[in-house]
Amino acid sequence: MEFWQHIYSNFNVIAFSIFGLKVHWYGIMYVIALLLALLLAKFFVKKFQLDINEKHLDSYFIWVEIGVILGARLGYILIYDANTMYYITHPWQIFNPYINGEFVGIRGMSYHGAIIGFLIATLLFCKKYKTNPWIFLDLVALSVPLAYVFGRIGNFLNQELFGRITNVPWGIYVDGILRHPSQLYEAFLEGIVVFIIVYLARFKQSFQGELILVYAGAYSLARFICEFYREPDFGIGFVLWGMSMGQILSFIMFITALLVYICIKFKKVNI
């Protein structure tokens, strides 16, 4: 366990450089996650014979990727970043990948902000092409969780979003302090476990939109649990009743998904 506990001391967050441009492992994991999500979506379209053509699917993923990036970055700045006012007065710095002249990529993304950007992009896309948004949302619920695993592995390799102080033997040292590898807990619970739940729910699906609601509920519950092992965001700490901002947002997400599910499932609301 000695090597594992000191893995950050023996690992470079930069995978390689091209003409002086440093390529980080996080960026590589992000690209893998994006491609895997698209490939899984195409697989599930064929497997479950969904009424989505490949051209629309490719276009849709471009739309939602833009929405996710915008939502994730803006969400982080508005919710988590300690320099919110700076970015509001200097909006051109929001997507600036350079710090002191060095390319470091775009840092600081919020998952809950990404969700909002994703939903807006989905609604705009479906309105433009006159398609049913619930079909696409259910497809995303199936294809995203496994891809999400690579996103959290990317966080781990980038040595960010680390866990709380611990004494468990599988902990890792971060700046000389033993901490939970919470990114890997999240990869398992929020990625693999959530996928299994959504995939099994597909075979008992009773209405369009059910899978995305199951995903939202399962993810928010998994995230709420993982937050107990994840270090609260810098500058925010614990917000209410000993809960982190991630837990509060996950709680809101869970209640929202549950209420919508109940309204549709038991009150026969047309969608």
Swiss-Prot record:
A 1,2-diacyl-sn-glycero-3-phospho-(1'-sn-glycerol) binds at R152. It is found in: Cell inner membrane. Keywords: Cell inner membrane, Cell membrane, Membrane, Transferase, Transmembrane, Transmembrane helix. GO terms for molecular function: phosphatidylglycerol-prolipoprotein diacylglyceryl transferase activity. Pathway: Protein modification; lipoprotein biosynthesis (diacylglyceryl transfer). Its main location: membrane. It comes from the Bacteria. It is an enzyme of class 2 (transferase). It is a multi-pass membrane protein. One of its GO terms (biological process) is lipoprotein biosynthetic process. InterPro entries: Lgt (IPR001640). One of its GO terms (cellular component) is plasma membrane. The chain crosses the membrane at residues 25-45, 60-80, 103-123, 134-154, 181-201, 209-229, 235-255. Its EC number is 2.5.1.145. HAMAP family: Lgt. Catalyzes the transfer of the diacylglyceryl group from phosphatidylglycerol to the sulfhydryl group of the N-terminal cysteine of a prolipoprotein, the first step in the formation of mature lipoproteins. Belongs to the Lgt family. This is Phosphatidylglycerol--prolipoprotein diacylglyceryl transferase. It comes from Campylobacter jejuni subsp. jejuni serotype O:23/36 (strain 81-176).
